[in-house]
Amino acid sequence: MLGLRTHGLDRYEHYIRRPSDFGKLELQDWLNHKSFRVSPNLLIDSSTTREWNEPELFYQNTEDETWVRPCVGPKLEPSMMMLRYHDSNIGQMPQFCYPISSPINFKPVLKYILQERSELSDGFPQKYNTLIGSLFDIDKNPETLDDSDIEALDDIEMSSDSGNVKEPKIELQALEEIQQKHFSLIVSNNGIFQTGSTSITYIQSGISGSIAIKPNNVAILILLTQPSGHLLSILPLDDGKETYLLQYWNLGQKGQWNIIKHQNEKQFVLIHKELGICKFFEFHLPFTFQLVNNLTLTDSVIMNGSFFPTNYTDLDPYFIIFITAIRYERIVYFVIEWNNNEIKKKEVYQLTVFDGEKTNMTIPIGLNACLVETPLKFSLVSANQIMSGETEFHSFQLKALKGIKSFFPAPLLLLKLQELHPHTFKKFQYCTIISSSTGNICFCVTERSTIVNGNLKFYELTRFKGLKSISPLPSNPINLDSRSSSYVLVVISFSRTLELTLSLEDLRCLDKKDVIKPLKNITFKHTIDSSTEENSQILAFTSSKFYNTHTGSNINDTRNSQVWLTSPNAITQPCIDYKLRKTHQLIHLKQFQIFRHLRIWKCKNLDIALLQRLGINQSNTESSLIFATDAVSNNRIFLLDLTMTTTIDNDDPVQGLINIEDLLCDTENETILLNFTKNNLIQVTRDTIYIDPIGGDKELRKISPGWEFENVTYNDGILIVWNAGLGCVSYIENIDAVDESGALVSNLSSSKGMSKFFKQLGTVTSVNFQIKESTDDPTKYDIWILLPDCVIRTPFSDWISDSLDFSDVYILSVQQALINGPYFCSLDYESYFEVHTLQNNCFKKGSRCTSRVNFQGKDIKFRSFGVNQCLAFSAFEIFVINLTPIHDSRELDFYKLKLPHLGNNNSILEVCPDIENNQLFILYSDGLRILELSYLTSNNGNFLLKSTRSKNKKFLYLDKINRMLVLNQDLREWECIRLSDGKAVGLDSQLLKDDSEEILEIKELPIATEDNPLEKKTVLLISFTSSLKLVLLTAAKNKISNQIIDSYKLDNSRLLNHLVITPRGEIFFLDYKVMGTDNEMSFNKLKVTKHCIDQEERNNTTLRLTLETRFTFKSWSTVKTFTVVGDNIIATTNMGEKLYLIKDFSSSSDESRRVYPLEMYPDSKVQKIIPLNECCFVVAAYCGNRNDLDSRLIFYSLPTIKVGLNNETGSLPDEYGNGRVDDIFEVDFPEGFQFGTMALYDVLHGERHVNRYSEGIRSENDEAEVALRQRRNLLLFWRNHSSTPKPSLRRAATIVYEDHVSSRYFEDISSILGSTAMRTKRLSPYNAVALDKPIQDISYDPAVQTLYVLMADQTIHKFGKDRLPCQDEYEPRWNSGYLVSRRSIVKSDLICEVGLWNLSDNCKNTV
């Protein structure tokens, strides 16, 4: 590999096997405090095989000063719920979609790149490192482009080793002749992936900018910029399945870097807008770029930049860049020009636009011309105008184009327009398609003289909701056909990527106020990918309603646990631990609802004689031959042509479906086999074998052995029928060779080997035979006999010679089995799917692989689905399982089909795959449906909402009616969405609009109501600015009504935007009012009670809100959020740095109520608190000042809390090595303070907030008094024994020294909530999980005891319950089983490095 190193390694790096900043201790602390327990990165045993993010933990034995590995984990309290990491669903927020072309045979390309790298390495000078290092140390004028240090690199003599024998050189011209494959690639916020695929190339540090560039005629590269300040060059191959990093470059500055490229695809520029930096790059080799020089605009902020289109030729190659910037609070236009012959010599022109506006976007639209968008207008700017100092530009307004989002040049569209409408478009030479933030898509056409005559036209294409970006499809056949009146492009709308086919017949030229109608000119839209929304909330719940057709969020879920993500645009149900493949229904044939079994043949695969008999003259027809039977007495055969078929609502015959009446031999008896050979039709009923010659004068032959067939199997002319109960087996060696007398039918019932076999079976009647080609000789066949407890293989040659030997036995317990090529697929008796590989006609040792999907309680059937896939289906589900394991593991990958919602009783009877056309023929109870397989996705459901521009929405799942309630706070509207199909029902919004106060929150109350069997009632609580409303929701007769039951008003105070409803139906809320510099805040507890309206009629009751408990306090700060665990309130302030506990809120009086600060990690800020049960809760915390982690999950348990002075403070359960620290804290005792006379003080304020204790309470039992007395004694102790006391932090403050109290934890050591801050022994968390991305939201499903964590990049982590045994030998897993991201291959101490790194999942490389 080739690299430029900027600095040396850390001095202790050679001690580290795989260095990391994660959890690194300060080196000086490590040297000074030798008794530190944890050294996760500095002391890793080099002989281990652990991953870098699975450090071994060591501690130092103080006796002999040796480091040893701990073998015993700490005992955990029984009340501590442990949640372990289970799985993740990587988020994929699409940003851009690029058309990609790459060679089908890409191995020569990789060899060429290695050859290019080898040539670079051979010619790399030794002085290069020193020169580059000195280059970055020189302080230069940032606006000087003549960089002499970079030019000096050309003067260095390149030395190479001429003695090496090199392989034959691969020429680039040979690679250009390789056939190309075209696909679309999506760049998300954290990775790249092919459209319709769930396999993502994960970019660990994120993506801030991207562009597709083609510096050669072989393959397209993707250039990515990262927020960390790195430029990556990515080569996607094999439909995006293979992704390679070719080169990275350290840009020297973090932040947002934008990429612009020239039309020749070899020159590109990186722009850092905030810092005003431009970096100029060039592909000097087909797959390698280099930095040419830099430009820094001092005291400037760059707004936009783009290349001017130029007449680029090899004889006169020149480049012009247009940049708009703010410099000294003025709008400045820059033009940078250079010639390719003198690439480092650039000329800079600038023009100050005194009355200019900030630019939103600059778009190259013609020769040396750019379209500049400002908030009020559009301007046409040319390079010549800026160079000559002109300040008057052609300006205009255009409403449809306001807020430009993306654009691309469209030469293929211009060719179509010139062919379809020559009189209008013949004079134009340039065409650009532009999209706006309002969803409008239009195109601009210009001519060479547009700058002079101002002749540019804008024409409408369409308008599409939620538009984020657009991209071309240059390889699409419709776009390549200039005579076609349609044009296809790709759009990203919300989280979906679609192909839109647009009609070019009726195009309207846009005026400045014209509005484009939604979906205008769209003739066909096709979704090719469904990814992730920018969700803000995650909801996890278990629905009491279970539907057979519903797909849950977890694969083996039997309790209908669901996860939903919410955003202002949509609600989405993700699949956490599996993938889905969407399907598209082509047709529904109701005529087939009387049948129970199907068999499908593609007519193009049948013999020509049979096609002629069917009346088909074309051998390449796409028609299908369908055999259907009701398994009793009705046998039919149909010919279906999908190109002529239309779906109708009634049961009349459908055009394109033909009933063939004279093809079957028997239409009245149950048929168990129908097949075709080259010469014959074979039909087998329960007692007869029919052989019907397709052509010629031969007559129909019947074979009836005289006993009933239990089943039949057939393969390539070999047919076997059997009845295990009767002990009868017969076979036909070659069915085409059977004569009229049936002499070639062999009966093995009297065979000595077969007779012995049936005797050994005893009462076992479940026997199945399968005929398969031999794995070592394809001309031979084996007969596999499947029994409940074993599998037997016999060569078919032994059947012919009557020398059967059943010694080749494999002990295997199976429920179902299928042999698909070299794979033996089975369902074991634990209902797991497993595969054994066949090698040399036997089971390959150690080849057993399984899938994680469990089919327990489901009647599963297997079907072959190609060479390497198996299809497994039940009454309501279809799975496709890959038979090759994932990488080097023993796990089989699979996906589930997303089937149409057809009701809870419409079951699947049969599935017949059409692999060539990617279709499935599925026989449902209501008929035959033909589905086309579409894209893979991680979303089970994605339903768009109304009013997507309204960002303030609340979401609530209502279990009783199985609906998602969506409350639009901005428009004061609400609706209910059925989660099975997304159908929305609007609710009466009058009660929301009658109240002018702001809507804050909505919750459901777990209250049982007297339900009418025909009605379902739900009680809701809605909080406004200063009131609460109790609302009854009633669902009946497909309508949902609502009414206000009761309301609760607050006087002179406002509610916090947070409500807590406990499982017992208790209501907790917080209100506050501002009093000078303080906030008077109150925690309130309400309960819902029943009141009789009429005392005589006891049944006539209503619900009322009643205040039960109220706790008022004063605070400098505001409570940010809180939750209730049992009867304890957990709260945090607006800064989120501290966490507080109010114990026994309901059972304590104001005088005895305590507020305790809980221990938090000093670098963490609370984001959200949620209870896990009556004892435990979890805190989502943000770690903003750390480089090694971004967030934490911190777990607390309330039953372990013991109140008292902390003389033995244990360290936090952190793998980062927090030790004991002796420090001070300060307390201001208020004037007139008397020990034992007051229970609650705000020691920071020195103000009294509650009344004195009653006289009946003895002071010696006062917990606060005991604590304060101990503090006073401790104060005297330190005054007598401390020779050098620490200075006071504030005047008039009494300094209190307390052992083992760190100011990092409690800076002011007082409760902001207004009570005496009590230091406790067990207020620290019992577990913490470090995460490498910021947390967006968390949600807990108590029914299945599972925690779901939504990260900022939309990745979802799943943590499941794992109650740990209290045994000494138990060793807990590090970080609860969650492994942080792998170490990046990008080295922070290198300026650049070129190579060939495979970024596929199995290679474990990441950037």
UniProtKB/Swiss-Prot annotation:
GO cellular component, one term: Cul8-RING ubiquitin ligase complex
Keyword Ligase: no
GO BP terms in the entry: cell division; heterochromatin formation; nonfunctional rRNA decay; nucleosome assembly; recombinational repair; regulation of DNA replication; replication fork processing; transposable element silencing
Region span, Required for interaction with MMS22: 1-600
Keyword annotations: Cell cycle, Cell division, DNA damage, DNA repair, Nucleus, Phosphoprotein
Lineage: Eukaryota, Fungi, Dikarya, Ascomycota, Saccharomycotina
Disulfide-bond pairs as recorded: none
Protein origin, superkingdom: Eukaryota
Descriptive protein name: E3 ubiquitin-protein ligase linker protein MMS1
